[in-house]
Amino acid sequence: MTDVIDAKPEEAKKVPPEVEDEDSGDESAPEASAAGGEATKKKKKKKKPKKKKKAAEQSEPPRVGLSKLFPNGIYPEGEIQPYKDDNAYRTTSEEKRYLERITCEDPDETYQNIRKGAEVHRQVRQYAQRTIKPGMTMTEIANLIEDGTRALVEENGLEAGIGFPTGLSLNNCAAHYTPNAGDTIVLQQGDVMKVDIGVQVKGRIVDSAFTMTFEPTYDKLLEAVRAATNTGIREAGIDARLGEIAGAIQETMESYEVEVNGKLIPVKPIANLSGHSIDRYTIHAGKSVCLVKNDDQTKMEEGEYFAIETFGSTGRGRVVDGGECSHYARKVDAPHVPLRLTTAKSLLKSINKNFGTIPFCRRYLDRIGESKYLLALNHLVQQGIVEDYPPLYDQQGSMTAQFEHTILLRPTVKEVVSRGDDY
């Protein structure tokens, strides 16, 4: 520890008495004294400049709530993409700009809610990208991400918090894996890990994902999926048809190959996974953006939110359920079923209070004090009240990758709210 030396004020310098001479009675002396007195007075009046308040900065690991970093409540806008073709007029339309202003005045609809969630996402994921290393357990990685999310979004019940369980799916597991209690899986040097993070503010969910590798073998797989996601974003827009967007995604994805052990393997889009529309407190709102061309003539509409996500694989390009389930969500249209199990009634009450229709995992139930709940949870699933989302796997030995962004179809422009410098 550095020794701090006390800085004592300098003692007044003693002027040695001068030898008196015949001029010691000079009349100018009083004038000089008076001038010195005036100077002393002026010095006393001089005020020290006020120190400017230092702007709040994010900590490492990130724990500073965003309201402290953005005290005016205005959060960074996402990437803006103008509409094209028949919708190009929207960018300059007075009518559409007026509609956008009205939307922003509604405290529930304001874009600031989703932009806050997006900024939380960017700061948390960029810390995760710097920090995650082989040798860490899946539980350590999940906690690293979720602790940061809770702190930055300033978790407050259903008002703000985690948007869904942190996905950490490895290798041929494409989606819906997060560690349950007691999980001992350790991240390996050769793993391909999909990191899917959700943040919600007043029910506005930001859903964005990226893929991490620690050696170059599967770089082309990641490049293919990232390019396919950006193609989907480019083609998305008001009145865009979902089937046509899917065709563009497929074309981009299939233009890539990966070389593994001297063999070229085509990258396939995972045909039975898709992007989706998002509603308040509802992660899957009904519309699907598939990854292979189809005849779906459904159109995207003004004001809608979409998660544009693509998955690529070196395997079959199809996934099946497998492994221990961790992800669950209460159904939006859950039936009113009389529950005979007292434990199921109690668990449902807890789910409604803490999560509503926001997806959750077993670790989150542990965190709120629930125990011995598996029988009750399975009963709620069997009764159609809660949906389970088991992990999804392509064939053994294959590798899968994912990239995803949340977009907002504003009346005037398309905003990629979760875009960052990283992807």
UniProtKB/Swiss-Prot annotation:
Cellular component GO terms, alphabetical: cytoplasm
Compositionally biased spans, kind Basic residues: 41-54
One protein family per Pfam: Peptidase_M24
Residues that, per the record, bind a divalent metal cation 2: D207, H276, E309, E404
Intrachain S-S bonds: none
This protein's record includes keyword Protease: yes
Swiss-Prot/TrEMBL catalytic activity: Release of N-terminal amino acids, preferentially methionine, from peptides and arylamides
Main subcellular localisation: cytoplasm
Comp. bias regions, Acidic residues: 18-29
UniProt GO BP: proteolysis
EC number annotated for this UniProt entry: 3.4.11.18
Region (Disordered) location: 1-89
Binding positions for substrate per the UniProt entry: H176, H284
Record's keyword annotation contains Metal-binding: yes
Segments of skewed composition (Basic and acidic residues): 1-17
Required cofactor(s): Co(2+); Zn(2+); Mn(2+); Fe(2+)
Known role: Cotranslationally removes the N-terminal methionine from nascent proteins. The N-terminal methionine is often cleaved when the second residue in the primary sequence is small and uncharged (Met-Ala-, Cys, Gly, Pro, Ser, Thr, or Val).
HAMAP family from the UniProt entry: MetAP_2_euk (MF_03175)
Protein name: Methionine aminopeptidase 2
Source organism: Schizophyllum commune (strain H4-8 / FGSC 9210)
